[in-house]
Structures are given as C-alpha cells and as structure tokens.
C-alpha cells in the first residue's frame, strides 16, 4: 500500500460523471457466465482488485476471460468441464469472492482451497460455513471460522434455512450451493438484503422464486443455465461518495449518470431525501436492475435522522460516508442495527468513529452503530484507511470540509472498488 496520499481538493464540485460498474453485480456476472457453457459478454464491469480475484480463479478453473474495451468476453467450457485447481485459490481482500465461492465450489464438489489476504484472514466465515454444512458441504476453516477454507467433494442437499443476519453474501453462498442439490432450498430472510443473485440467476435462465422474505430454489437448477450478455450499471456504493461530497460542499451541483438503483440497494437515496437533501432522479429505466441519473446539489441545514431496521441492509456499504453526512446535520443522528459493519474490511463502526474523531468530528460508537453529533472539521491530523477502501474514500470526502490538505495513509486501498476515484473527484473540482 502507498504510505500516504495528500488530498488537496476544494469546492465547489460541478459536472457530470459516471462511476465504475457495480462491484456486486460484476462478481456475480463473472461467476454465472463462467458456469454457463458458451460465450457471455459483460459490459462496463468493475475491474478493481476484488473482481480481478474472481476472474483469476475462474481462469484457473479453465474459463477464458478476455478484457476488451470496457467489456469482458467470457468463454466457458461449462461447469461440468472445470479443472481441479492445483494451487490455492487466492481471493485477495474480497469477502464476496471468498464467501460466494465457498458455496459455489462446495456445490460443484471441486477439491480446492480458498484463501485471501491478512484482512480476509480476520473476517468471520462461520456464518457461511454453518448453513453450507447443513447442506452436507464438506468444507472446513481454521477454528471453523477463518480462511483458508478447505473444500472437498460432497453431495449437496436442500435445506429450509432461517437467516441469522441480513447478509447478501451468506444468502448468495447458500443459493450458489443449492444450484447442484436434488432437493429445493427455502431461505427465509430477517430483512430484505440486496437481491442481485436472485435477479441475475433469472437473467442467466436459472429458475428461482422470491416473494417477500422467502426465496425458493428449483432442484438441480444449474441444468437450466444459459450464457447471457449483461450490462453492469454504475455502482451506487461508489456514487455515494459523490452524492455526499456534493451535499456538503457549498456551491456544488453534480450529476451522476447510469447508477444502479435496485430498491434493495438504494438506501442512501431514501436517507438523503429524509434529511432534506437536494437530490433528483431522472432518465430512469425499469427492469430487474433499474438505473437512473442522479443530480445532487449542495444542501445546508440537513435534518438529523435515525437509520435503523430495514433501511440498514439497503445502505450497509454506504454507512461510513453517510455518517460523515450526518455530522453536517442540524441535530444528532443515530445509526442502529448495523452490527454487520463489524465484519467488513475493518470494524467500520470503530474505524469510522476513530478516523472522523481524529479530524475533530464528534461520533460515539455503540454496539450496533453510531451516535453522530453536529460537528466540524477542526484539525488536520494524519488519518489512515486501515486498508479499507470505503474508509479511504470517506476520508477524502471529509477533506472537502477542510481549508488545508489532508494526509491519508494507505489510500491506495480505494483501488479495490474504485481505481479512478481521486482523478474523478479532481475533475469535478476543476469543472467547478
């Protein structure tokens, strides 16, 4: 990691941009295209470090993936012709790759070992291993909780599973394993979590039924899979940094085009509207993965908010930068029910509070979230992403509230999801 990045950007921010393709959808598109025999094309994928780890693994399994002018051309021999890997499958910093492939490789019955970087080695895997073992997967981790994960051939069975947490990664691991079961699987969710796996199964011709909090699979659904082309919308989690940047920087007027606004992911839009932020959606498309252009303008006197319940999984990855936004409200805001933040790249409850407090903001971490007081940038302490891409970008946005440059250690963590983040932010500064 680069030791230090000096962020020296001032407002107003003005202009029109696009953000990189959605990370969650890119992962799933690569996985499904690789399972389907034939040729699939993925347009405008995210080619950050996380998604490249997923690509690398499927190449080892025998899939040809070519990068060609903002698209991936995936040519697969089909899942039945995958190679048995003779080396550890390295997932890097990608929790999505690790957890979803734990389910998929268990279902395939391919003897393999999944292992990631130091950060992944600290992230709990028991929440995925428990349901997979109920499905008779032969999968073991260190202390039944940590990578490396050792997978051996097994025959997967269907289960009726009540989710313990609102986690799209856990749900998706179960769904990918269930593709190979001779019995149906039923999943009951606590709250609605992002549903990209379900929508993309359908896109690749895999039958699945989802209604309310219940999901039902079809026995041996993998036999229905067909190759398909997929257009990846812009990642709302990446757009979130520009949404907040425009809202808190005087004189700003920013438009972001082609952003995915799947209702299971669009919590930040709901939150900004509740806070009275000046945000408008237009050019909306409908379908399984709807998109829109989003215009955001500087908004003083934002209203405080309590973020809890079903709103939390709809905005889970955006909560660090939303916490920054809440420091600019006229009263105290609260984030609750967000224990899931503890098992991200860092414990994002603690890292968000610690780093913003270093800069003079006033946040109190709680067991399941944050209490955020109206507060201002007071000191130019050196801060640290702690190798967490979303913390790094959140701190860069916070620097817009400072009249002096801000130093951020390990800033190149942002390459995990948004390799061109800083140049894009500077582009808006120059246009402003």
From Swiss-Prot:
<keyword id="KW-0808">Transferase</keyword>
<dbReference type="GO" id="GO:0008652">
    <property type="term" value="P:amino acid biosynthetic process"/>
</dbReference>
<dbReference type="GO" id="GO:0009423">
    <property type="term" value="P:chorismate biosynthetic process"/>
</dbReference>
<feature type="binding site">
    <location>
        <position position="390"/>
    </location>
    <ligand>
        <name>phosphoenolpyruvate</name>
    </ligand>
</feature>
<feature type="binding site">
    <location>
        <position position="348"/>
    </location>
    <ligand>
        <name>phosphoenolpyruvate</name>
    </ligand>
</feature>
<keyword id="KW-0028">Amino-acid biosynthesis</keyword>
<feature type="binding site">
    <location>
        <position position="169"/>
    </location>
    <ligand>
        <name>3-phosphoshikimate</name>
    </ligand>
</feature>
<dbReference type="GO" id="GO:0003866">
    <property type="term" value="F:3-phosphoshikimate 1-carboxyvinyltransferase activity"/>
</dbReference>
<comment type="function">
    <text>Catalyzes the transfer of the enolpyruvyl moiety of phosphoenolpyruvate (PEP) to the 5-hydroxyl of shikimate-3-phosphate (S3P) to produce enolpyruvyl shikimate-3-phosphate and inorganic phosphate.</text>
</comment>
<feature type="active site" description="Proton acceptor">
    <location>
        <position position="317"/>
    </location>
</feature>
<feature type="binding site">
    <location>
        <position position="344"/>
    </location>
    <ligand>
        <name>3-phosphoshikimate</name>
    </ligand>
</feature>
<dbReference type="GO" id="GO:0009073">
    <property type="term" value="P:aromatic amino acid family biosynthetic process"/>
</dbReference>
<comment type="similarity">
    <text>Belongs to the EPSP synthase family.</text>
</comment>
<dbReference type="Pfam" id="PF00275">
    <property type="entry name" value="EPSP_synthase"/>
</dbReference>
<feature type="binding site">
    <location>
        <position position="95"/>
    </location>
    <ligand>
        <name>phosphoenolpyruvate</name>
    </ligand>
</feature>
<feature type="binding site">
    <location>
        <position position="167"/>
    </location>
    <ligand>
        <name>3-phosphoshikimate</name>
    </ligand>
</feature>
<dbReference type="InterPro" id="IPR013792">
    <property type="entry name" value="RNA3'P_cycl/enolpyr_Trfase_a/b"/>
</dbReference>
<feature type="binding site">
    <location>
        <position position="317"/>
    </location>
    <ligand>
        <name>3-phosphoshikimate</name>
    </ligand>
</feature>
<dbReference type="InterPro" id="IPR036968">
    <property type="entry name" value="Enolpyruvate_Tfrase_sf"/>
</dbReference>
<feature type="binding site">
    <location>
        <position position="24"/>
    </location>
    <ligand>
        <name>3-phosphoshikimate</name>
    </ligand>
</feature>
<keyword id="KW-0963">Cytoplasm</keyword>
<feature type="binding site">
    <location>
        <position position="23"/>
    </location>
    <ligand>
        <name>3-phosphoshikimate</name>
    </ligand>
</feature>
<feature type="binding site">
    <location>
        <position position="23"/>
    </location>
    <ligand>
        <name>phosphoenolpyruvate</name>
    </ligand>
</feature>
<comment type="subunit">
    <text>Monomer.</text>
</comment>
<dbReference type="InterPro" id="IPR023193">
    <property type="entry name" value="EPSP_synthase_CS"/>
</dbReference>
<protein>
    <recommendedName>
        <fullName>3-phosphoshikimate 1-carboxyvinyltransferase</fullName>
        <ecNumber>2.5.1.19</ecNumber>
    </recommendedName>
</protein>
<dbReference type="InterPro" id="IPR001986">
    <property type="entry name" value="Enolpyruvate_Tfrase_dom"/>
</dbReference>
<dbReference type="InterPro" id="IPR006264">
    <property type="entry name" value="EPSP_synthase"/>
</dbReference>
<dbReference type="GO" id="GO:0005737">
    <property type="term" value="C:cytoplasm"/>
</dbReference>
<comment type="pathway">
    <text>Metabolic intermediate biosynthesis; chorismate biosynthesis; chorismate from D-erythrose 4-phosphate and phosphoenolpyruvate: step 6/7.</text>
</comment>
<feature type="binding site">
    <location>
        <position position="123"/>
    </location>
    <ligand>
        <name>phosphoenolpyruvate</name>
    </ligand>
</feature>
<keyword id="KW-0057">Aromatic amino acid biosynthesis</keyword>
<feature type="binding site">
    <location>
        <position position="28"/>
    </location>
    <ligand>
        <name>3-phosphoshikimate</name>
    </ligand>
</feature>
<feature type="binding site">
    <location>
        <position position="169"/>
    </location>
    <ligand>
        <name>phosphoenolpyruvate</name>
    </ligand>
</feature>
